[in-house]
């Protein structure tokens, strides 16, 4: 029971520190002209808490759990986060198809590395490069494109800080003439924001250590298979922040922020997150369940989500279907793989 309490406390601290880190980073970027969608991908899509936890787990020789959080987070972003956003606040959304193609194809980037397992530091370098290339493509397109919709980036800042933004902050400009697809984040006191970001980063490191200690105890006490635990329970504890960062923007009339969070989180998770875990923690062995179960589910859920977004309207039926598939993933994972101990011979 003590291990469970340690895990819950660590996960809660991870989410809290991640929110503060996002707020600090957005504040530092306050004087820049940046696309709101690009901001969402970079500042909410990059999962600092997940990275901190994954690195801590791999350093402590819990590579199976670390790999499980990679798959689990990516699957939960569509099966929980996007699903709840569609159910709670159906909305129209306009995301370029090229972004959706990259989003749908992103899980397939893992396939060659999984097939040639174990995963190594050199694989991590390639995965990091793929994420940088993705961000570079999105940034280049956003900075030179035009769109009739101009959204105030202050919304992202308030949401990232744990607050809410009034609906009137979201405004539309006439199609003619088109407005540039970037917004100015209001200038903040940069030194204070930098200090906040650094403090939150330290908190993430401490929280990740506490959480990994709790996970280690749970695995020993309850004999749960490592990748399974990382892909389900540990992931669910870390999903609260993403649910807020996706549902609230939809409800406030800024769906680009929520969808950007989902797209950024999935692409980051299967590339840079795994890459950083490998570079800092070393080699990870891949069990058969990854190729036969977790990866196919991730490919299916991501492709289906990309299709729903491509229709231009996230509907409740889309959310219910994604949520049902995620529940089925949990049920099958525990009933089929749940009895395999992490150190089983």
Kindly give the residue locations of the regions a language model identified.
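Hydrophobic alpha-helical segments, chiefly the membrane-spanning helices
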Residues: 1-345
């Amino acid at each position: 029971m003590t291990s469970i309490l340690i895990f819950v406390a660590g996960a809660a601290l991870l989410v809290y520190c991640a929110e503060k880190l996002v707020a600090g980073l957005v504040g530092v970027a306050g004087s820049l002209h940046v696309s709101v969608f690009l901001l969402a991908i970079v500042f909410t899509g990059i999962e600092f808490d997940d990275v901190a936890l994954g690195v801590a787990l791999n350093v402590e020789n819990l590579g199976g759990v670390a790999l499980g959080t990679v798959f689990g987070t990516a699957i939960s972003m569509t099966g929980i986060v996007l699903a709840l956003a569609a159910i709670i606040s159906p909305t129209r959304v306009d995301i370029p198809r090229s972004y959706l193609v990259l989003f749908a194809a992103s899980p397939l980037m893992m396939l060659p590395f999984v097939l040639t397992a174990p995963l190594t530091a050199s694989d991590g370098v390639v995965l990091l490069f793929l994420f940088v290339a993705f961000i570079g493509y999105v940034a280049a397109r956003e900075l030179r494109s035009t769109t009739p919709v101009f959204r105030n980036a202050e919304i992202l800042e308030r949401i990232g800080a744990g607050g809410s933004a009034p609906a009137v902050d979201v405004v539309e400009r006439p199609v003619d003439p088109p407005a540039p697809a970037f917004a100015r984040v209001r200038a903040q006191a940069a030194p204070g924001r930098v200090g906040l970001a650094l403090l939150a980063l330290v908190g993430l490191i401490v929280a990740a250590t506490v959480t990994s200690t709790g996970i280690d105890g749970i695995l020993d006490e309850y004999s749960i298979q490592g990748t399974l635990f990382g892909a389900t329970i540990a992931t669910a504890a870390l999903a609260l922040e993403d649910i807020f960062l996706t549902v609230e923007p939809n409800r406030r009339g800024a769906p680009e922020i929520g969808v950007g969070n989902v797209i950024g989180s999935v692409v980051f998770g299967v590339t840079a997150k795994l890459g950083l875990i490998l570079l800092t923690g070393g080699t990870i062995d891949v069990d058969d369940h990854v190729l036969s179960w977790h990866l196919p589910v991730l490919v299916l859920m991501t492709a289906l989500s990309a299709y729903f977004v491509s229709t231009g309207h996230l509907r409740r039926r889309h959310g219910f279907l994604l949520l049902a598939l995620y529940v089925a993933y949990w049920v099958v994972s525990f009933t089929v793989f749940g009895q395999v101990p992490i150190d089983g011979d």
